[in-house]
């Protein structure tokens, strides 16, 4: 039994959900518009402002996709209503981040700077008080993938903790070399 799949989704007044043929769903809201094609075997019903997701049988595949479908729908509704933000922290003395048009320029201690093109649907904000990057968008998966792509450029090293990490991420530290006595 999927506990997540059986929960109902409450649709806010500011969000419009359209269920078209073969479970093609369009969700529009104040932040933007998202579209997704769900598995056609899953039943998705919109009753007034409540969405119910149900499966036709108890096969293993249907059990797996039931909760996933409900979670994706919930994320779509939350994304077009409020949006999602991933925050990255940059730890290191000479590490810098610049925003030039549609490009993100990262200076991460390499002999060259790294230039990343910002995709459509992603907004980037560089706060002034802390060294970091705020990645915003309406698609939770897309925002997370882009943030992960940036974080992989310079993973935090265990001795000084220098690198790019997600906000609140704990880095396991190691002791340095000890001298002989």
From Swiss-Prot:
GO terms for molecular function: rRNA binding; structural constituent of ribosome. InterPro entries: Ribosomal_uL6-like, Ribosomal_uL6-like_a/b-dom_sf, Ribosomal_uL6_a/b-dom, Ribosomal_uL6_bac-type, Ribosomal_uL6_CS. Signal peptide: none annotated. GO terms for biological process: cytoplasmic translation. Keywords: Ribonucleoprotein, Ribosomal protein, RNA-binding, rRNA-binding. GO terms for cellular component: cytosolic large ribosomal subunit. Coiled coil: none annotated. The keyword RNA-binding applies. Part of the 50S ribosomal subunit. HAMAP family: Ribosomal_uL6_B. Belongs to the universal ribosomal protein uL6 family. This protein binds to the 23S rRNA, and is important in its secondary structure. It is located near the subunit interface in the base of the L7/L12 stalk, and near the tRNA binding site of the peptidyltransferase center. NCBIfam families: L6_bact. This is Large ribosomal subunit protein uL6. It comes from Phytoplasma mali (strain AT).
């Amino acid at each position: 039994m999927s506990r997540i799949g059986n929960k109902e989704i409450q649709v806010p007044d500011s969000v419009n959900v359209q269920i078209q043929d073969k479970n093609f769903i369009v969700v529009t809201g104040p932040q933007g518009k998202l579209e997704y094609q769900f598995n056609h075997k899953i039943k998705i019903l919109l009753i007034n402002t409540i969405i119910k997701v149900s499966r036709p049988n108890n096969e293993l595949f249907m059990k797996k996709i039931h909760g996933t479908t409900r979670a994706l729908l919930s994320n779509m509704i939350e994304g077009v209503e409020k949006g999602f933000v991933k925050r990255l922290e940059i730890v290191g003395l000479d590490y810098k981040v610049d925003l030039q048009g549609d490009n993100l320029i990262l200076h991460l201690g390499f002999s060259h700077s790294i230039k990343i093109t910002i995709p459509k649907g992603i907004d980037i904000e560089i706060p002034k008080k802390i060294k970091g990057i705020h990645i915003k968008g309406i698609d939770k998966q897309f925002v997370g993938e882009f943030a992960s792509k940036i974080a992989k450029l310079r993973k935090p090293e265990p001795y000084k903790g220098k690198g790019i990490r997600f906000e609140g991420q704990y880095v396991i530290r190691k002791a340095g070399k000890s001298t002989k006595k």
